[in-house]
Structure formats: structure tokens, C-alpha cells
Amino acid sequence: MMRRRGLMALGALALGLHPAGAAPRRIVTLGGAVTETVFALGAGAEVVGTDLTSRFPEAAAALPRLGYVRQLGAEGVLSLRPDLVLATADAGPPAAIAQIEAAGVAVVRLEEAHGLAPALVRIRAVGAAIGRAEAGAALAAAIGAEVAAIAAGLPPGGAPRVLFLLSAGRGAPMAAGSGTAAEAMISLAGGRNAVEGLRQYRALSAEAMLAAAPDVIVTTTDTLEGVGGRRRLLALAGIDGTPAAGAGRLAAFDALALLGFGPRLAEALHGLARVLHPGAVLPVMARR
């Protein structure tokens, strides 16, 4: 019930931000998925600055960067003269956000969306906040339909055990436990988290990875590049003895697409589902 109330409040906040016909003209977006959503809704030309996590699309990556989303400076944001700041809930520090609001700039905070329902609520909320409510509703509906079509194509039963690695190669690999975006995507794709007993992201010993016995290992393209490629990752202690390593079942995805629960949610889910269920007949996805 509390989660549902939070989602309803989120939508109400964005809906009440601007009077009809007064869409913002200078927007600062803080958070990769938020930025991507604004661009997907056709308002990229109004974005004047972003944070370091906003790497897609290319036009967003070319805009002025305001630092890391949790370590912002109010002066940098205000120097861009925004009339709206769209930010994830973890944007901060709180003093910087308060200073931006005190300067008369509207700030909309958007909760992290680790699941389909909150992701669609966030897309609609972004659309309402930037004066594109109809476009936001249409995009959310399209993504919801695409995810439903993917789910319909998944084979029943036999969920593969999936280990998601957020980092590897420097110390013990960091794996995704429960309550993470990675676990939510694994579940949507018809898989089972191999380390579901963990909470959030935790370092795993070699023994723990062997005990997890994943059928598939999933990571990000940045992590795979950082460790030196597929062969090196699969040869890491603990990983090398897993069923996934033995079968060579390793897949890497763009981090924002896979974990951001933004406009590319269905596209990323489609790719993950194909990895987990090679024989499944899945629909063709639109690229965003």
C-alpha cells in the first residue's frame, strides 16, 4: 500500500508542477534514465545540462555536465538558468537541492524505478512535468505492451540461474542481490537470481560464486571491458568453475539500458530474454 501511495504521489507532483500551456523551456536533468526519457519524449532541445550518468543519447552526452548526481553544486546548476530541474530521488546533497529551490527553480524528484510499474509511472510523470503528458502516456503504454509481449513468449518453467556482476577484476566481484534493478530485470526475463539471498550489491568470494552455480553470467559492457574481455572474466577464481563458465554463457549489456528502467527497457529486456532462453520465439522490438 505504501509503495502504491508513493507512485500516486509521484505522478501528482509532476502533474501539478506547471500550469497548462507553460511547458518548461530550460531543463536540467539529473539521472541517466530521466535524461533519456526527456529526449525520448521529444524535449531534448530544451535540456541545457545533465549529470555524469546521462550518457545516452549522444546529444545528451554532449551537453554541459554538472558532476555526479549525488555530489552536485547548486551554483553550477543555477548558472544554466533552468526553469525546471528533473532529478532522481538520490540527487544531492540536500543542501544543494534546497539552494536550487530557494532560487525559485522548480525541482521534481523522481524515485528510482526498479520494476515495470514504477518505471511506467516515472515515464508518465516526466511527460507531465515537461508539458508532454500525452507523449509520456503513449510511451509508457507502448513499453508496457512490449514487455507483455516478451513475457508471453517466454517458455514456462525452468528459470535459469543468473549471476549479475556489477564489477569484477579489482578485488572480489560485486554481485546483485535482492532489491536491485538487476534482479528485477532477471525476473522479468524469466530468470532466477543465483544469489537471491543477498541484499543489494555485495562482494562475493570465489567459494560463494561456486556455490551460486549460475547457468548464465550477465554484466555490463563497461565491466567486461575493464576486466579485459570475456576470456579473462570467465577465468576469474570462482567464476571459472561455474556452469556458466563451462558453457561460455556470458552476456554484457549497456548499463543504463539494462538497469535504468527507462525508454529502452523493453529493448534491453528482449536482449536479456534471448540470452536466458535461446530457443524462445520473441517479438521484434522497436529501437529507441
Q: What role is predicted for each listed range?
A:
Residues 31, 89-90, 112, 166, ...:
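Short secondary-structure boundary segments
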Residues 1, 18-30:
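C-terminal segment of N-terminal export signals and the immediately downstream linker at the start
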Residues 176-201, 221:
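His/Asp/Glu-enriched short active-site or ligand-binding loop at hydrolase and phosphoryl-transfer sites
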Residues 6-22:
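N-terminal export signals
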Residues 75-81, 205-213:
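Short helices/loops that flank or line small-molecule/ion binding pockets
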Residues 93-102, 216-234:
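A ligand-binding cleft/hinge motif common to bilobed small-molecule-binding domains
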Residues 26, 84, 95-172, 193-197, ...:
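Extracytoplasmic substrate-binding proteins
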Residues 26-80, 84-96, 230, 239:
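A short, structured surface patch at a secondary-structure boundary
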